């Protein structure tokens, strides 16, 4: 299984998992003794849909949001990048914290909505389907667990608006899990593939420019009606970005290539296969020679 994704991207230990039917006792509301405490020392990983919602709420481009409000981090060594919410300058508090609570509450990130629950997306190496489980986070400062309010995780997710957030980030989680479960079999990502991944997942406005470019038209045979609809709908464009990445990173073709581009791609694949076959034959010959030499010793 892969390691959990958010909010424990670096944890080597798998927390105790529970299902959506698990009942928690929890409430967070103004007036509770720990109000705003969890927002004073943040470590919040953002999903691509989080970035989309927050940049729209702030009325800025995704490029500006990434520059001013996030910091990048590696999900795994030599792997794809994630982004975390940048705290206040020279501090650890969330930049959106106010005495009355969150300043962008309606568009708050997934991790904030889930707290004190953690989403654990898993995928077995021989499966494509990801499976969601949950873990309960208990921190010393949090008084919410002392409130006698029982609710299942499934109902808590509905209450916090997480069904929409999880569904629109599922394509991204599947990409992350596929990369993590594939491991060395697909090799270390190239700089170009890491840049494409980061742009398509997080910088949706730059990705729109990328899809609008003539070079994209020359490579992909995307119907003009579909393309026009994508360019005016951030959410649809983000889902398309996940399809695009599955194709360019893992070869799962769902976007048609232009005939000339398809021929060129086929030629490159055949050339790569020929090189691999030659290398394999060379390796077998060297092994056979080594075994023959040992036989004469």
Name each model-derived stretch:
Residues 1-37, 44-46, 50, 56-63, ...:
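Short loop/turn segments that flank or connect secondary-structure elements
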